[in-house]
Amino acid sequence: MISVNDFRTGLTITVDNDLWQVIEFQHVKPGKGAAFVRSKLRNLRTGAIQEKTFRAGEKVEKAHIENRRMQYLYASGEAHVFMDNGTYEQIELSEAQIERELKFLKENMEVSIMTYQGEVLGVELPNTVELKVVETEPGIKGDTASNVTKPATLETGLVVQVPIFINEGEMLVINTAEGKYVSRA
């Protein structure tokens, strides 16, 4: 059990027999009445986001999530195959389970698979990934007013806004949390 006063971003808890990850939280001490913790939680099974308020000092069950380092091997129809590098055990995840992460996954990429009591919850990506530009408009010389961007399609199908000087074939560093361009690789 953990007190809601000890909440931190990324903490995984069990509330109403469901797994939730704390996205945001705020301790509120009103001038009148008891203190409370206002939180925004993401359901790890469905992806739904819910705002929930807890009384200060209230206890919730902490969920012990296991993270396994795995390698993304390939897509086979609707299934995506991952392999544990230590045991060579392979697991398949459906497109629905990793819909958001698919935009960043490349073959042979190392990721962390989150599991809870043997149930696969999802894929945790690295903070940044390197992806190749497969399609973008050529930059026009002299068209540099200020922070000019253009759309670029990357090798995974993800479309991001990039500076005008980026060309096809270049490797870019992309932030996986926001899906935005960071720099050239």
Swiss-Prot record:
Keyword Protein biosynthesis appears in the UniProt entry: yes
Subcellular location as annotated: Cytoplasm
Molecular-function annotations in GO: translation elongation factor activity
GO cellular component, one term: cytoplasm
Metabolic or biological pathway: Protein biosynthesis; polypeptide chain elongation
Keyword Transmembrane found: no
Entries under PROSITE patterns matching the protein: EFP
One Pfam family named in its UniProt record: Elong-fact-P_C
GO BP: peptide biosynthetic process
Keywords linked to the UniProt accession: Cytoplasm, Elongation factor, Protein biosynthesis
Disulfide bonds: none
SUPFAM superfamilies the record matches: Nucleic acid-binding proteins, Translation proteins SH3-like domain
PANTHER family assigned to the protein according to its UniProt record, in alphabetical order: ELONGATION FACTOR P (PTHR30053), ELONGATION FACTOR P (EF-P) FAMILY PROTEIN (PTHR30053:SF12)
Primary role: Involved in peptide bond synthesis. Stimulates efficient translation and peptide-bond synthesis on native or reconstituted 70S ribosomes in vitro. Probably functions indirectly by altering the affinity of the ribosome for aminoacyl-tRNA, thus increasing their reactivity as acceptors for peptidyl transferase.
Family membership: Belongs to the elongation factor P family.
Protein name stated in the entry: Elongation factor P
Organism: Bacillus cytotoxicus (strain DSM 22905 / CIP 110041 / 391-98 / NVH 391-98)
